[in-house]
Amino acid sequence: MHIITIRLSLANVFLVRGERWIVIDSGAPGDGPAILRAAARHGIAPADIGLILLTHGHIDHFGGAAELRASTGAPIAVHRADLALLREGRNPTSLRSTGLEGQLLRPFLPWRTTPLEPDMTFEGSFDLSPFGIATRTVHTPGHSAGHSVLPLPDGNLIAGDLLRGGFLGGRLRGRLPNPPYVVTDAAQQAASLQLALGLPAHTWHIGHGGPLAVEHIRARAKRPGLA
């Protein structure tokens, strides 16, 4: 399955092809036009986009969604457990850093933005069959309460912020598996990582850095510090 990766200043956005194109995550506030320009370079017009799917409700992942919806008419979908974050236009104050880099980055994270009302919310999993891909999201809480990943039929996994790659937003050693910068629940995060490692995937496409080879994730998970 063809995956288009758009690397923005704060986070990655992915496009996958169903009946129409599906945009997974939307970057930070103001990133909508950059996503559309990148899509156009691949011959994708706004009318070709049929869904905006959010892996979770942090501002660096939903910030551009309203702009994308206004330009494409595509609905926005997110797990119900993160609905309040979108409606309040904020990141949760309960975010806890997983290491020094997360502590250093906290002051620079976008903490508030314009509230967003999604078009669709889901409990558990979201079925993408109506959009032309025979798969469902998998709920992987920990980074956020509603964090979800998307396994694709060909063995790729759109993994959001379940892990990150390398350092400095993936600019340094971007294919090295590392824990996310922040979590809301460390125990849930550890359980979700194990759940995702049980999915039939060979490559994880993540929000910061990547992609990550599953064999590298498994090797790294044998040592302390990944979850």
Q: Where do the protein language model's features map onto the residues?
A:
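Residue-level marker for buried hydrophobic side chains located in beta-strands
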Residues: 22-24, 53, 76, 156-158, ...
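Binuclear metal-ion centers of metallo-dependent hydrolases, dominated by the metallo-beta-lactamase
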Residues: 212-227
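Conserved beta-strand hairpin/beta-sheet module of binuclear metal-dependent hydrolase folds
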Residues: 1-42, 149-165
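Glycine-/small-residue-rich active-site loops that bind phosphorylated ligands and cofactors
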Residues: 23, 60, 212
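Active-site HxH/HxHxD metal-binding segment of metal-dependent hydrolases
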Residues: 32, 40-120
